[in-house]
């Protein structure tokens, strides 16, 4: 990216932020019936027409995680109290897919998902204003969330989770996925040294974990066993039309694929199935 492109990108971001804080700035209500999923972009909600159609039954090896978040979401959709959720742990184990499956499960019961990246979190007051008082139930979905020190959006999200953000709406929950349990990078230097004349150095460390503590429900994901990986690969093979099951040849190929990738995640299993089925055409 040349300097002009960098300048234009930064200018566009600045204008977007200015529009959200100007006194006369307005955000138009979207057509909530046009889609079940929306994406917050450039200060507006855009419908996502082709949201991934995945069912809860398609997700293997995470039965406990499925039940915990399904129960929380069920309570919320039915008008009961429920918690904000942090899904954290190993990559490719179904964290994002689980949120998508929940939408497909409950979209017919007025559940809506709004996907937002961490740069857009500073616009949370605008989103709260859009959904407040509406009959639908909304999940604000932050995928692959993590923060660096003093990064934009951190304090806004923290205030929202505390319920301090413009009377945070009772028809809106936050579901976030992250590979980090505490959402912020931990450094050895935080534990081995103090900075300057700081009297209470451990308070800085506690601040780093304080954001994740504000999620009422923590759901952890772990690497899959070999048997779980093969079961997921078999499910994906069936999805792509393979009808010969997990025979010895396919099993060896699936294990070799995972070995070459250094992972037995569900994502890797899906990638293997695509490759294998594509080769059979």
What spans do the regions from the language model cover?
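Conserved catalytic/switch belt of AAA+ P-loop NTPases
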Residues: 149-197
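C-terminal alpha-helical "lid" subdomain
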Residues: 2-27, 222-281
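AAA+/P-loop NTPase substrate/partner-engagement loops
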Residues: 105-138, 144-150
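Walker A/P-loop nucleotide-binding motif
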Residues: 79-101
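Phosphate-binding P-loop
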Residues: 48-50, 74-82
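Dynamic helix-loop-helix/coil hinge segments at AAA+ ATPase domain boundaries and subdomain interfaces
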Residues: 2, 44-68
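Pre-Walker A adenine-sensing motif
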Residues: 64-78
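Conserved AAA+ ATPase "SRH/arginine-finger" region at the nucleotide-binding site
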Residues: 114, 178, 188, 195-209, ...
């Amino acid at each position: 990216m040349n300097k002009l492109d960098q300048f234009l990108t930064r200018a566009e971001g600045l204008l977007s932020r200015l529009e959200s804080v100007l006194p006369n700035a307005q955000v138009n209500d979207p057509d909530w019936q046009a889609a079940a999923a929306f994406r917050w972009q450039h200060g507006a909600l855009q419908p996502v027409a082709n949201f991934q159609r995945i069912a809860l039954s398609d997700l293997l090896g995470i039965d406990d995680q499925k039940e915990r978040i399904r129960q929380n979401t069920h309570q919320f959709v039915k008008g009961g109290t429920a918690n904000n959720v942090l899904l954290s742990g190993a990559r490719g184990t179904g964290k994002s897919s689980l949120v998508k499956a929940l939408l497909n499960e409950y979209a017919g019961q007025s559940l809506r998902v709004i996907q937002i990246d961490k740069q857009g979190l500073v616009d949370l007051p605008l989103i709260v204003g859009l959904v407040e008082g509406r009959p639908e139930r909304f999940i604000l979905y932050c995928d692959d969330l993590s923060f660096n020190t003093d990064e934009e959006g951190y304090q806004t999200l923290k205030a929202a989770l505390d319920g301090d953000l413009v009377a945070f709406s009772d028809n809106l929950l936050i579901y976030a996925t992250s590979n980090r349990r505490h959402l912020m990078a931990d450094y050895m230097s935080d534990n081995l040294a103090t900075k300057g004349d700081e009297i209470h150095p451990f308070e800085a460390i506690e601040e780093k974990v304080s954001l994740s503590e504000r999620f009422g429900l923590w759901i952890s994901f772990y690497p899959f066993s070999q048997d779980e990986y093969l079961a997921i690969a078999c499910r994906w093979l069936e999805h792509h039309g393979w009808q010969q099951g997990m025979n010895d040849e396919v099993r060896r190929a699936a294990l070799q694929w995972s070995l070459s990738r250094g992972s037995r995640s569900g994502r890797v299993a899906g990638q293997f199935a695509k490759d294998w089925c594509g080769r059979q055409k």
